[in-house]
Each structure stands twice: as structure tokens, then as C-alpha cells.
Amino acid sequence: MPDMKLFAGNATPELAQRIADRLYISLGDASVSRFSDGEVAVQINENVRGSDVFIIQSTCAPTNDNLMELVVMIDAMRRASAGRITAVIPYFGYARQDRRVRSARVPITAKVVADFLSNVGVDRVLTIDLHAEQIQGFFDVPVDNIFGTPVLLEDMQSRGLDNPVVVSPDLGGVVRARATAKALGDIDIAIVDKRRPRANVSEVMNLIGDVEGRDCVIVDDMIDTGGTLCKAAEALKERGAKRVFAYATHAVFSGNAADNIKNSVLDQVIVTDSISLSKEMAATGKVTTLSLSRMLAEAIRRISNEESISAMFN
């Protein structure tokens, strides 16, 4: 069996170290820095010939820098004769640009990134909770898109929720909400239906479902600025919700996210370490981070040993 080696870029070094610790191996020796003009500089400082190489790198902000680090590291490994190269991308950036809407003159950037990674020589991709599952079809190599839900469910089950209801923040998240509700014992779901009655009129948050006197669990794949999430939480509290928790795999937290979350009626926001939490977000006092390291370490072990990934979720 080829020797397994883990390497990390600069996007999520803490997560990479946690994964390495769980696999009882050291992170590989690689220098990932910048030339004086800002270009990515990579050097692999150990032998990887014939090795089963895993490169851990989220393509979160700064998205272009982190993507280029990943691409250049893959190329360096390929030129160093690595046996197999798996890109472990906990958060896959550009995933929200996955289609052309009404033939608009826009790119399908998720496809561009998939081609970029495939063409540079990656053999396999491991990621978590793609924003759109069909992105797997953009790749010409195998893609394992695993689910962060089990990590979030453990936390939900430990909180002693009072007569809980799972809430989808929009119509597009109903499938996720229903699956979460089923995993929690087939509990009720509610849906926040956001709509704008007419031009230049504020959005209205219509609530479908009963939340009065109940703990609400909002579930989503990611939180960006948090604006819609905070409005949804406000609508739930106005309808009599007891407590409101928000769960998401990816803590994008861009723009005014820190202020939005800090000043919101949300009781707690629970995310994972697919993206490192900024000091500004940590200072809000409302954000809890769960680690994906155990799940990713097990997935990496299974890939290296040619075992089933889907069996992890049976």
C-alpha cells in the first residue's frame, strides 16, 4: 500500500493539524509562501514519489489566493511523481456560480474551477456539503461530497432542546430541514418564505409552521453576511419562538456578518471549522465552532485504504 502523506496550504492550518493528529501522522513538510510580487511560491521539502498524497485546503476567502495555492501544490506533487493526489477541500469556493440563470451572460465558475483542478492533475476530490451537489458532475475525476450534518446533529442532541422545530430559512432548504428533522426523531419543520410583494417594498418574512413556545433550529449549508438568517430569527421570535439556534457547515461570514450576528436575536450560531473563524466573529460571543477533523480523518483513511465512503453514513 502506498505511503499516506498529508499536506496543508494556508487556508485552514488548524483543521489540517487536527486531521493529522487523528490519523497519528505528521503533516508533510512543504513551504507555501509568496514571492516578492505576491505570486504563490511552493516547495515540497520531502520525498513524495509513489505516495498517496492528500492536500488539505479550503478555497475560502481570500478565495483566489487559496485556490492558487491548492493548484500550485497539486502541480508540485504531480511533478514530484506522487502516486495519487487527493484534494481535500472542506469548503469549495465558487460553488454558488453553478448555472446560467435565464441565459444571462455569466460564467459557470464552479465548472471553471473543476476544470482547473482536473487539468492540473488532481486524481480525486474530497469535499463537504457542496452548495449544489450537481457540481460533482463538473469534474472528470471522482468526487466524494460528504455531509457535515452528523457533526451538527451531535450538538443539537446535546442541547436539551425544548419541543424543537427545524426551520428552513428559505424554500430551497426544505430538503435539508426535512432530513435534519427526521434524524432528530421525525420532529416538525417550519419554513421561512421570504418574498418582496412589489418593487421598492421591503421583503416580507412569511412563516409556515408552528413555532410558538418552541426552540427553533435553523439549518443551512453556509452563512454569508447573515442578513437573511438574522431576519428569519427575528420573524421566529416575533411568532413566539422560545430560543433560536442557527446551524451551518460553512462559516463564510463576509461583509457585515459580525455586526449582523452580534446585534441579532439569535441565541447561538453553530458552525464547523471548514473555514477558520476570524477574531472579529469570535468576539461576538454568539458563535460556536465544531470540528470536522474526525469525519475528514476517517474519510481520508477510507480513501487511502480503498474502503467505502458511503458506509460512513449508513
UniProtKB/Swiss-Prot annotation:
Pfam families: Pribosyl_synth (PF14572), Pribosyltran_N (PF13793). SUPFAM superfamilies: PRTase-like. Gene3D superfamilies: 3.40.50.2020. One of its GO terms (molecular function) is ATP binding. Its EC number is 2.7.6.1. It comes from the Bacteria. This is Ribose-phosphate pyrophosphokinase. Involved in the biosynthesis of the central metabolite phospho-alpha-D-ribosyl-1-pyrophosphate (PRPP) via the transfer of pyrophosphoryl group from ATP to 1-hydroxyl of ribose-5-phosphate (Rib-5-P). Mg(2+) 2 binds at D170. ATP binds at D37, G38, E39, R96, Q97. Binds 2 Mg(2+) ions per subunit. Pathway: Metabolic intermediate biosynthesis; 5-phospho-alpha-D-ribose 1-diphosphate biosynthesis; 5-phospho-alpha-D-ribose 1-diphosphate from D-ribose 5-phosphate (route I): step 1/1.
